[in-house]
Design a protein with these regions (language model features):
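Glycine-rich Rossmann-fold phosphate-binding loop(s) that bind the pyrophosphate
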Residues: 1-4
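N-terminal Rossmann-fold NAD(P) dinucleotide-binding loop
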Residues: 7-8
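C-terminal helix-to-coil terminal segments
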Residues: 39-43, 114, 119-167
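Gly/Ala-rich phosphate-binding loop of Rossmann-like dinucleotide-binding domains
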Residues: 11, 15, 107-108, 131
Length: 167
């Protein structure tokens, strides 16, 4: 859910692992995902965006790569209810995108098998219930702290400045 740069990178890895990828994005109707193999071969897959409902109903793994734009969670009890029994959800997007109470309820009742979170509604201190739950894996949101990520941010900023002054 969310099929921009990060969502497409996750899709690339999922396809490489043999998974069928479903995507939902308000702004991207389709994307071409190219896998580069060790022998120089390339294979491109076109992934078309579908409805949120289709993604939730059809996925064993749901990953979130969306901004937090509203006060309401994007994934709440209703959305979790659409998900496959035993599915898992991964949020590396923003805290508050998932209703944590609805998530805990679904995990406790066995609707969902697991959750992986590196962002929380109450950052930097997730609730004790999240931290202690056996079916939730928590990690710090530090993906942008790598040297490669910082280099990419610098390059993107420089490109935007150059593009601005070339207008």
């Amino acid at each position: 859910i969310g099929f921009g740069r990060i969502g497409q990178e996750v899709a690339k890895r999922a396809i490489g692992l043999g998974m069928n990828v479903l995507a939902h994005d308000k702004y991207t109707s389709e994307a071409n995902i190219t896998l580069n193999f060790f022998n120089g071969d390339k294979k491109t897959f076109t992934i078309e965006s579908t409805s949120l409902k289709n993604v939730l109903k059809g996925s064993d793994f749901v990953t979130l790569h969306i901004p937090k734009l509203e006060d309401k969670a994007v994934i709440g009890a209703e959305e979790i209810g659409l998900m496959k029994d035993g599915a898992g959800i991964i949020n590396t997007a923003r805290g508050g995108v998932i209703d944590e109470d609805a998530l805990m309820f679904a995990l406790d009742k066995g609707k969902l098998a697991y959750a992986a979170l590196d962002v929380f509604t109450n950052e930097p201190n997730p609730s004790i219930h999240l931290m202690m739950h056996n079916n939730i894996s928590l990690t710090p949101h530090i993906g942008a702290a790598t040297l490669e990520a910082q280099d990419r941010i610098g390059e993107e900023l420089a490109e935007k400045i150059i593009a601005y002054f070339n207008k």
